[in-house]
Amino acid sequence: MDQSLKRQGRPKSEEKRRLILHAASSLFLQEGFANTSMDSVAKASGVSKQTVYSHFDSKDTLFQAAIKSKCQSYQLDTQHIDTVSTSGVSFKECMSKIGQQFIKLLQDPETIAIFRVIIAEAGNNAHVAKLFYQAGPDSSLVVLSNVIYDYGKGRIDQSVANQLAVDFCALLKAEHHTMMLCGIQAPLLGDALVKHVSTAVDKISLLFNHSLN
């Protein structure tokens, strides 16, 4: 067990859950979804299999929790995004903050690795691809579309907000994400990252303003 992961003052249950998620994330990346078992997760995290099941009732649930945890580490979960959107910042400022975190998440080596794992396994196991999509991309789109809808203040339909969320993510990914997955593109850093996100924000702002009733 990685002793460096332990922190003072954490409830034992929370600490064990964190250790399980950490071990599971590593195993899913190293072994793939199909070759990772709850037994191996228990062994890697230093807890019993019963303890693993007390936190996650199935491997599917554990896998999705690992994906959601990664998104949360970049403040792209509902709680963090709601905090940004309700802090009084403008639409463009909110989209800029979300966009920069989104790009940083996509460029994270573990994120790239899990995308590659999913692509490799999807042909023989569409189930794991669906689990990943639900916990990661789809969940993020739902949160983002709700933020966009709220900024519309009743002047935009939810269906339009949903499409704008899809459009914004597409603008952020551009060709950069595909090239990153192929290993032929270096991460965007500093001014280059800010410029890339700013361009996407300018475009989605135009679409947003055009969509207002």
Question: PLM ranges: what are they?
Answer:
Residues 1-4, 142, 146-149, 153, ...:
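C-terminal peripheral helix-coil segments that are non-catalytic and often amphipathic
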Residues 19, 27-61, 65-69:
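Helix-turn-helix
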Residues 8-10:
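Arg/Lys-rich, glycine/proline-spaced intrinsically disordered segments
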Residues 43, 57-61, 65, 86, ...:
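Residues in soluble alpha-helical coiled-coils and helical-bundle/repeat scaffolds
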Residues 69-91, 181-191:
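Short, flexible, glycine-rich and Lys/Arg-enriched loop motifs at helix boundaries
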Residues 93, 104, 109, 113, ...:
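Amphipathic alpha-helical packing segments from all-alpha helical-bundle domains
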Residues 65, 79-108, 158-168:
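Hydrophobic alpha-helical connector segments
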